[in-house]
């Protein structure tokens, strides 16, 4: 409560009898209000409570500072004297107040309580009004601040929503970017891992291939080592073979062979009923093939002993040519007819000429029956020949003889072929002149008397065809040929004669051509051999008549069947009117062949 209001209340509530006692207090406090009159003080306390409060504030402060109850009591006691002093003074505005004014006219002590109550009520009303205004202002300010706060909050919410939306958009963009980047990185990593796996697999395959190739290389090295060892062994064997061939004594071998074949075979006159049937024959064959050219072959066989009791051939005589003689004496010794042992079987078979063999072989051919020369005739077997008897044996012998005679008459003056180690020579005899055709160069014709002498020798030998030899320049070995075309005439038979052997004109110092490891003898040796063979052929021709009357026809028939079988083993292509030589070393790709 304000200080002035309290003073007034105290002043109004104090009875009147106590005014004298308190006058001293008023005097004590008179200095405090000496600057203002009482009316001004009261007026200010009624209409300007703030001023009264400001004025009373120092007093209230001083009272509180003193903290003494005595001073307060003294101050309260001096209040009624002030009120009474105010009542005695004139009004400020001078005049009656119709409305009663703020203060009514001075009243008595009994009515002063009502006035104070009114004053308090008015004071309360003014205070309430001021408080209400203050409160209203405060509420309005609060409301305005709330509105402002609400607007600011709404603005902040809008801003926050926009910011949050932008943040969300940016976060979504960042998430998408991160997802795409991670997917790309995953793809790259997967491709890298896959490439690495493929590379490792390829490396493993390459390692496997390398190991396989390494194994193959090792195997190849081992094979090469084996081949080197094999080559060394073969070279050693070749050296040993060369040493053995170098140690071979050809003259001693020839002497031993001569000693073995010089002794004639012992024949039992009691068991031998017919002379030897094997003779020196020029066997001819003829096979007509439309797609091939005729090839000439010639076989030479010497008398061989026939044992009718055993049904097989005994060792007979064959023309054996010695090997590599260095002088004429050894050649003459080797040129003598030799008796060789024949294989003890029932068949006399021809040896097939091998074109790819380095060592030349003279084919031995047997006689051919009438079925080979007469069209439509079949070769009989052994059982058929045995069943037919001795009558058919005679017809076979006649056909065989007539075939030889016709061949002799047709090819009496045929050309002779001989070969030089350097070139092939073809000698044609015609009208007393000799023409030689070679591979690289030509030779001058021989003298006419040599050709004439050859014809005389052929006539002396009863028109037996000349055996021609064809030499291979590659291996320096001759090949015998056979004149083939036949035209049989029944009832004719002439003795057989051995062929004429020719000497190579290109080798005057060493007139030797190896045949089966042997040599071709000079003229003296040829003459001796021819005389020997002529005697043998005459002996054989005298005994031919015994074939038909022999009681051992079956054995003889089997012998001829053996000859026929041997002849039929190697069929030849022939054409009448042509005489060609077959070179053992001939090849279809060789331009040097005829």
UniProtKB/Swiss-Prot annotation:
Its main location: nucleus. The modification Phosphoserine is found at residues 588-589. Residues 434-454 are annotated as: Disordered. Part of the MCD recombinosome complex, at least composed of IHO1, REC114 and MEI4. Interacts with REC114. Interacts with MEI4. Interacts with HORMAD1. Interacts with ANKRD31. This is Interactor of HORMAD1 protein 1. Residues 109-135, 165-189, 219-245 form a coiled coil. Required for DNA double-strand breaks (DSBs) formation in unsynapsed regions during meiotic recombination. Probably acts by forming a complex with MEI4 and REC114, which activates DSBs formation in unsynapsed regions, an essential step to ensure completion of synapsis. Not required for HORMAD1 functions in pairing-independent synaptonemal complex formation, ATR recruitment to unsynapsed axes, meiotic silencing of unsynapsed chromatin (MSUC) or meiotic surveillance. Residues 434-443 have a biased composition (Basic and acidic residues). One of its GO terms (biological process) is meiotic DNA double-strand break formation. Residues 444-454 have a biased composition (Basic residues). InterPro entries: IHO1 (IPR031529). It holds the Pfam family IHO1. The gene is IHO1. It is found in: Chromosome. One of its GO terms (cellular component) is condensed nuclear chromosome. Keywords: Chromosome, Coiled coil, Differentiation, DNA recombination, Meiosis, Oogenesis, Phosphoprotein, Spermatogenesis. The keyword ATP-binding does not apply.
